[in-house]
Amino acid sequence: SLSDKDKAAVRALWSTISKSSDAIGNDALSRMIVVYPQTKIYFSHWPEVIPGSIHIKEHGKKVMGGIELAVSKIDDLKTGLFELSEQHAFKLRVDPGNFKILNHCILVVIATMFPKEFTPEAHVSLDKFLSGVALALAERYR
């Protein structure tokens, strides 16, 4: 679980990186579909599933909007992300294992874009936070 120190670190990092959240989302999703091509199946309804496409950019923006929501609900992710969990479980039917894959891609992109801010301490706190987000999103699968 997230300590007060972790929550403060996530909030501090988010205040810096949120201005670039659209680019982070685009880069993370683009990376995910290249490194983990099996994830493309969730986007087969798009005319093209290629890095940097308009659909990837739009969905990356949505994903990062979800991360922003999670930051604002950091004290109770399970309740705060209930509707997103329902949507992913029952409407989108995303395998919850893919949340971990996308989390990894988000971490890589943030580390690349913000090397100074992505300290080892920020890394561990953000990783714990994203793991908490994945767990909260998987809640409705049970």
Curated annotation (Swiss-Prot):
Iron found in the keyword field: yes
Pfam families membership: Globin
Alphabetically ordered keywords of this record: Acetylation, Heme, Iron, Metal-binding, Oxygen transport, Transport
Sites where the protein binds O2: H59
Disulfide bonds: none
Residues annotated to bind heme b: H88
GO molecular function, one term: iron ion binding
Keyword Heme tagged: yes
A cellular component annotation (GO) from this entry: haptoglobin-hemoglobin complex
Domain Globin: 1-142
Biological process terms in GO annotation: hydrogen peroxide catabolic process
InterPro entries (alphabetical): Globin (IPR000971), Globin-like_sf (IPR009050), Globin/Proto (IPR012292), Hemoglobin_a-typ (IPR002338), Hemoglobin_oxygen_transport (IPR050056), Hemoglobin_pi (IPR002339)
Modified residues (N-acetylserine): S1
Highest taxon above the source species: Eukaryota
SUPFAM superfamilies the UniProt entry points to: Globin-like (SSF46458)
Tissue-level expression: Red blood cells.
Subunit structure comment from the entry: Heterotetramer of two alpha chains and two beta chains.
Record's function text: Involved in oxygen transport from gills to the various peripheral tissues.
Sequence similarity: Belongs to the globin family.
Full protein name: Hemoglobin subunit alpha
Organism annotation: Gymnodraco acuticeps (Antarctic dragonfish)
Gene: hba
